[in-house]
């Protein structure tokens, strides 16, 4: 029986799941929209909701708790500097999961997970900055 099963195991160990969701949460915070499989997106949603709630609190303890879950300091900084103030008035429901068809090859159900009031310019901004820096070095 499936009683009291709290989360999807995704055929991974605890450490692998923890690393997977830390990386995915960082990518979502950086790009504000990512494409992944539907079960991973559904499991990522409560993790992101809790991180944004920590960012809304904004104190030192909340920052340390977020840093314990995320891998990179720049993601923690972006979470507290941009996303926390953006959702200060919203009481939950910071991300949405949209179904995006099936993956060619294994027919895995795909989904797009994104922030509700996302900045469309955030997606690919790091790549654009890198390309501009490389072009500046060439000149």
Swiss-Prot record:
The gene is rplQ. Keywords: Ribonucleoprotein, Ribosomal protein. One of its GO terms (cellular component) is cytosolic large ribosomal subunit. Gene3D superfamilies: Ribosomal protein L17. Part of the 50S ribosomal subunit. Contacts protein L32. This is Large ribosomal subunit protein bL17. It holds the Pfam family Ribosomal_L17. GO terms for biological process: translation. The lineage of its organism: Bacteria, Pseudomonadati, Pseudomonadota, Alphaproteobacteria, Rhodobacterales. GO terms for molecular function: structural constituent of ribosome. Belongs to the bacterial ribosomal protein bL17 family.
């Amino acid at each position: 029986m499936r009683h009291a099963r709290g989360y999807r195991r995704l055929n991974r160990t605890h450490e692998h799941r923890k690393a997977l969701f830390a990386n995915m949460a960082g990518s979502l915070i950086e790009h504000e929209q990512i494409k992944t499989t539907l079960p991973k997106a559904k499991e990522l949603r409560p993790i992101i909701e809790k991180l944004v709630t920590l960012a809304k609190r904004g104190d030192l303890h909340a920052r340390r708790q977020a840093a314990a879950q995320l891998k990179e300091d720049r993601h923690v900084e972006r979470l507290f500097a941009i996303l926390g103030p953006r959702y200060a008035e919203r009481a939950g429901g910071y991300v949405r999961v949209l179904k995006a068809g099936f993956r060619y090859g294994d027919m895995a159900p795909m989904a797009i997970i994104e922030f509700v009031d996302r900045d469309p310019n955030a997606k690919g901004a790091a790549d654009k900055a890198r390309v501009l820096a490389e072009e500046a070095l060439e000149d």
